[in-house]
């Protein structure tokens, strides 16, 4: 039995999975399903960025005032829960994520959580490269922008939120550009990550593919 397979199946062992990918690539659904399969705590790192964005909007903080944003990033409570799926919040989160000091402050919360949680799957954009470079297993999920926009459109419609497909597509393209081109922790797969394009795959088929890789002898 491989060491990876042993850690995955023995729930008494520490096991850390880093799952990265762009917006609406399907990593959330896939991550949740994988976490259930291997008895892992499932954490979306984006929650701290979206929560900071929510706080900036709520407190009417101009996100170009970097010092105020940095100061606010020190006070994030990772246990707070809000409905943060709004695309405007996601856009603000992507903008403040380029600030090095903000990423440092928020990543400290995430690293602490990983270090104090024996079995965890953390999903985000730089988990395998920055937050948890020593994770036991790294996955990078992607899909073409049109497919991702359609997925997000359906998600928002299901929640009864008004949305326009083309606007969502343009927001995703803009966020991709910002995430990939930022100087601090740009969006890219770790060198040792398993890369999967989900454009034509169901979440279940992706999970099965990942499980086959983890559980192979």
UniProtKB/Swiss-Prot annotation:
Reaction catalysed by this enzyme: CMP + ATP = CDP + ADP; dCMP + ATP = dCDP + ADP
EC number assigned by the record: 2.7.4.25
**Which residues are recorded as binding ATP?**
21-29
Supply the alphabetized keyword list. ATP-binding, Cytoplasm, Kinase, Nucleotide-binding, Transferase
Q: Which organism is it from?
A: Rickettsia bellii (strain OSU 85-389)
* Keyword match Cell inner membrane: no
Is this entry keyworded Cytoplasm? yes
CDD domains given in the database record: CMPK (cd02020)
Please state which protein family the record places this protein in. Answer: Belongs to the cytidylate kinase family. Type 1 subfamily.
* Protein name (Swiss-Prot/TrEMBL): Cytidylate kinase
**GO:BP terms for this protein?**
pyrimidine nucleotide metabolic process
Q: Which GO terms describe its cellular component?
A: cytoplasm
What is the enzyme's main class?
Answer: transferase
Subcellular location(s): the record lists: Cytoplasm
The record's annotation in Pfam families points to: Cytidylate_kin (PF02224)
Q: What GO molecular function terms would the record report?
A: ATP binding; CMP kinase activity; dCMP kinase activity
Task: Identify the domain of life.
Answer: Bacteria
């Amino acid at each position: 039995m491989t060491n990876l397979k042993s850690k995955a199946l023995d729930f008494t062992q520490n096991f850390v999975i880093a799952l990265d990918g762009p917006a609406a690539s399907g990593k959330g659904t896939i991550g949740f399903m994988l976490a259930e399969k291997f008895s892992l705590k499932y954490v979306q790192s984006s929650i701290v960025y979206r929560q900071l964005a929510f706080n900036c909007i709520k407190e009417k903080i101009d996100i170009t005032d970097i010092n105020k944003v940095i100061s606010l990033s020190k006070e994030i409570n990772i246990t707070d829960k809000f409905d943060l799926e709004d695309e405007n919040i996601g856009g603000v989160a992507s903008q403040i994520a380029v600030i090095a000091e903000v990423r440092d402050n928020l990543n400290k919360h995430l690293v602490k959580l990983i270090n104090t949680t024996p079995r965890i799957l953390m999903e985000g954009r730089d988990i395998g490269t920055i937050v948890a470079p020593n994770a036991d297993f790294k996955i990078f999920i992607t899909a073409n922008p049109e497919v991702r926009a359609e997925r997000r459109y359906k998600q928002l419609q299901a929640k009864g939120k008004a949305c326009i497909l083309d606007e969502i597509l343009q927001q995703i393209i803009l966020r991709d550009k910002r995430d990939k081109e930022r100087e601090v922790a740009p969006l890219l797969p770790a060198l040792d990550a398993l890369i999967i394009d989900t454009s034509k795959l169901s979440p279940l088929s992706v999970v099965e593919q990942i499980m086959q890789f983890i559980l192979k002898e």
